[in-house]
Amino acid sequence: MTNTRKSHPLIKIMNHSFIDLPAPSNISAWWNFGSLLGVCLGLQILTGLFLAMHYTADTTTAFSSVTHICRDVNYGWLIRYMHANGASMFFIFLYLHIGRGIYYGSYTFTNTWNIGVLLLLAVMATAFMGYVLPWGQMSFWGATVITNLLSAIPYIGPTLVEWIWGGFSVDKATLTRFFAFHFILPFMITAMVMIHLLFLHETGSNNPSGVNSDSDKIPFHPYYTIKDVLGILFMMITLMSLVMFTPDLLGDPDNYTPANPLNTPPHIKPEWYFLFAYAILRSIPNKLGGVLALVFSILILTLFPILHSSKQRSMSFRPLSQCLMWMLVANLLILTWIGGQPVEHPFITIGQLASVTYFFTILILMPSTALMENKLLKW
């Protein structure tokens, strides 16, 4: 008699994806982030669902409903801070996952990679709208500033902004629709994750050497399930330490002041995970130019498969490319720091230099260095 796991129409799909899946024998801890992101998504949907039970998407009561969740709902403070800090964990893992993909050349799986870029955009949109919901000062002004960027689009811009706002400023209509989108998007993200995995399982996983591993596969379970559980354990320890000891470490104090359209905060800035893109946006004095640079700073990821000029897939055996990779990481950290600083000297100049270096490294330095390495290896 056939094993149910292998014959049942539904369980069979799970089996081929998580149990009997042939996986390379040498994938390192850098391959743990996929499962960690899945756990993060599940956690966000679950905590978000419980928050939505008590939250009211109305300008007059939104702020007090969040206060009510923290003060009066059983473990409401825990749910709220797990959701807020869970988003930070989500982005840490996202960036590490993308960094791994760049370092080991996983972007050569073009379909998987492009769906991944779309996933990143969807998660960024969801996080932005979620930040607006508590209706604090930074929520309101962040929403005003970021949505206003669309007015830079020629001809249709101003109309588009008013259409998104549902009026002539960020108000009740904006908050209500942002809540609706913030609720539905994670489920769309879940569907996209399934497509992401579908494309990945068409080719199989990459590995640190960047060489085809068909001749050396091991079953996903128990080897990588136990490895994933260890990763999840580390993640939960980190997340719960953050939630229990310093829940507001990554937040902005301004968001504990209720939204006031008549009073602008001295420094409007998004959550830390958007600061690098915000720094790129601010480094260009022209509005449309800034918006284009902002969009391209994310969409540039789609160019990696085209820009790959090395005869080797992975950077494991390419020391010069490794140096550039870490230069890019340092550059992004500088951009993140600059994004949180006021618009004044010397931060403006540092931001502009870091923005130019970001695009220059990806578009010119990395492909040309890869070609040089080919020459050095006489390929």
Swiss-Prot record:
Membrane topology annotation: Multi-pass membrane protein
Effect annotated for changing F50S: In strain: Isolate I995
Cofactor: heme b
InterPro entries: Cyt_b/b6_C, Cyt_b/b6_C_sf, Cyt_b/b6_N, Cytb/b6-like_sf, Cytochrome_b, Cytochrome_b_C_euk/bac, Cytochrome_b_N_euk/bac, Di-haem_cyt_TM
Residues involved in heme b b566 binding: H97, H196
Regions crossing the membrane: 33-53, 77-98, 113-133, 178-198, 226-246, 288-308, 320-340, 347-367
CDD domains noted in UniProt: cytochrome_b_C, Cytochrome_b_N
Keyword Iron-sulfur carried by entry: no
Binding site for heme b b562: H83, H182
Annotated cofactor note: Binds 2 heme b groups non-covalently.
GO cellular component: mitochondrial inner membrane; respiratory chain complex III
Subcellular localization(s) per the UniProt record: Mitochondrion inner membrane
Pfam families in UniProt: Cytochrom_B_C, Cytochrome_B
Cross-referenced PROSITE patterns: CYTB_CTER, CYTB_NTER
A single MF term (Gene Ontology): ubiquinol-cytochrome-c reductase activity
UniProt cross-references to PANTHER family, sorted A to Z: CYTOCHROME B
Oligomer and partners: The cytochrome bc1 complex contains 11 subunits: 3 respiratory subunits (MT-CYB, CYC1 and UQCRFS1), 2 core proteins (UQCRC1 and UQCRC2) and 6 low-molecular weight proteins (UQCRH/QCR6, UQCRB/QCR7, UQCRQ/QCR8, UQCR10/QCR9, UQCR11/QCR10 and a cleavage product of UQCRFS1). This cytochrome bc1 complex then forms a dimer.
Function, in words: Component of the ubiquinol-cytochrome c reductase complex (complex III or cytochrome b-c1 complex) that is part of the mitochondrial respiratory chain. The b-c1 complex mediates electron transfer from ubiquinol to cytochrome c. Contributes to the generation of a proton gradient across the mitochondrial membrane that is then used for ATP synthesis.
Family per similarity comment: Belongs to the cytochrome b family.
Name used for this protein in its record: Cytochrome b
Native species: Ctenomys latro (Mottled tuco-tuco)
Gene: MT-CYB
